[in-house]
Amino acid sequence: MLETDNQTPLKLDFLLLEKIARLLAPTQMVELVLVSGEKMREINRNLRNCDYATDVLSFPLEAIPHTPLGSVVINMSLAQTNALKLGHSLENEIALLFIHGMLHLLGYDHEKDQGEQRQKESELIKTFNLPLSLIERVQD
């Protein structure tokens, strides 16, 4: 189940994201928060001590029964910029970022694993007929 908190003026259809959430976490609730670039920088600075606006952050919650899996926070300003730059829709860019964030909530870590997140992300991109994600675009 997907719970959304759109803190931007943009109106979006969340149907694809709901399908992704149901596939990856069929019994758990996931929170999706859409924020401005300025808000993302503030979150990143306050919670990770990194003073810049990143594209997506994931905050898993403890594995306690009947609690949400966690939150995925997406920088809508950067998502819009990247969608235009890469020539695909904003909805597709958000879906790519959501998949990336969801995999982090599920314990994947592309900085430490042996390509497992990259492989799972590729499978999901094909399943949902999405363009290449950042993790795939920078692949060697």
Swiss-Prot record:
Protein name per its UniProtKB record: Endoribonuclease YbeY
GO biological process terms, semicolon-separated: rRNA processing
Its biological purpose: Single strand-specific metallo-endoribonuclease involved in late-stage 70S ribosome quality control and in maturation of the 3' terminus of the 16S rRNA.
Cofactor annotation comment: Binds 1 zinc ion.
Organism superkingdom: Bacteria
Compartment annotation: Cytoplasm
GO molecular function ontology, one term from the record: metalloendopeptidase activity
SUPFAM superfamilies, sorted: Metalloproteases ('zincins'), catalytic domain
Residues that hold Zn(2+) according to the record: H100, H104, H110
Top EC class, one word: hydrolase
Assigned GO CC terms: cytoplasm
Record-listed E.C. numbers: 3.1.-.-
Similarity comment: family membership: Belongs to the endoribonuclease YbeY family.
Nuclease in keyword set: yes
Cofactor(s) listed in the protein's UniProt record: Zn(2+)
Entry keyword set: Cytoplasm, Endonuclease, Hydrolase, Metal-binding, Nuclease, Ribosome biogenesis, rRNA processing, Zinc
One Pfam short name: YbeY
Gene (UniProt): ybeY
Alphabetical list of Gene3D superfamilies matching this protein: Metalloproteases ('zincins'), catalytic domain (3.40.390.30)
